[in-house]
């Protein structure tokens, strides 16, 4: 993958994207499809794209479609479950599939390299959680987006869906599961690099790795200067648009930008670990993503799940994540990241969130104290016949949850949020899950905010309709449209 020589590169670009992860790569791909003449610069402090949060070993890779993640359908006081978030996430993932299908049709992506069809299963144990899962099944399966969802409490059928989970389990134990066969596993690191490779081949994108943004400031309306530091030297570049898509590193850069919209934000870093199995005899027998129910007080990223994964083309099983706390904002960051992010404008919000979420802090600290035996006992709740020597511990990526100052005080937010300058000259993506799976939808939001005139133009609207045939329509209110979207994606992405 070609990397530019900093000293010899040009200094003016139509857009500069900081961080070479799935978000920046998706935005670059969209911009190029909408206007092939745009000159784009992507800056990455590591030595290649997609090595931080987008790397397969650093995220769940589920292809989040809300098929199996129970935290997206919380139980309500009246006994029902909320479905709005699940529907929104499902729609966003269908849009990602739609975009990948279009680029595949153009010969720019090879889906078999990064995308695998894997059933998505939700499993619960015990009568109380069975009632919750059955309520979720009844409500979701009545919606077109989840109409293919299956329900079972039959031990023989469950053993077909997830043999390793059922083997060695007591017959008297209450177990229930739902299953959607059209689930996916996505290697977002490989997808990121595929985007970048295609963009470089077109001549539209300059990639600068091993390069950090040391300073950014406004030169005037719709004009930014970024000072870049590289092993081979330094330079300054100018652009009318900056996107900060650096994962946990986006918040410090947003703060350095000085835009008033950044003042209300802070970050709460959460770390994680996986147990990984590469034994062929086991990986060949588990073909599903099996999600359980999070412990009370646990953050969403700690929902236990056992996943079939393809990491750089090799099949493995991942179980976890085991949550923890680190003051780093990036896996390859500094332990001073959290301290350096404290500002007069966000200090009070950070304290308020700490007090309001003391149970969460306590939970994370308790997870840090877990021994190898403790982690293995958690695994055995999912896999009764698990053997310790088949599994090794691996560190997952860092997630920086959003702390936002509001009229009611500091609030801890799960999910992602786009923060942009009033004039649309700068945008940043903060937060975490569901993240990568919704990249196309989130980057369309960035374009609506920051490229609004171009987005409203006839030429861009025509290109958007070709790229995303469902653009401007809600498939949740049009079952025929949803069916057409899925038929097209299934065919072009070779879902069989």
UniProtKB/Swiss-Prot annotation:
Q: Name the domain of life this protein comes from.
A: Bacteria
Species: Prochlorococcus marinus (strain MIT 9303)
Any S-S bridges, and between which cysteines? none
Keyword Flavoprotein applies:
yes
Q: Which UniProt keywords apply?
A: FAD, Flavoprotein, Oxidoreductase, Tricarboxylic acid cycle
Q: Which NCBIfam families match?
A: mal_quin_oxido, PRK05257.2-1, PRK05257.2-3, PRK05257.3-2
**Pathway connected to this protein:** Carbohydrate metabolism; tricarboxylic acid cycle; oxaloacetate from (S)-malate (quinone route): step 1/1
Query: What name goes with this protein?
Result: Probable malate:quinone oxidoreductase
Q: Which cofactor does it need?
A: FAD
Q: Which reactions appear under catalytic activity for this entry?
A: (S)-malate + a quinone = a quinol + oxaloacetate
This protein's gene is called: mqo
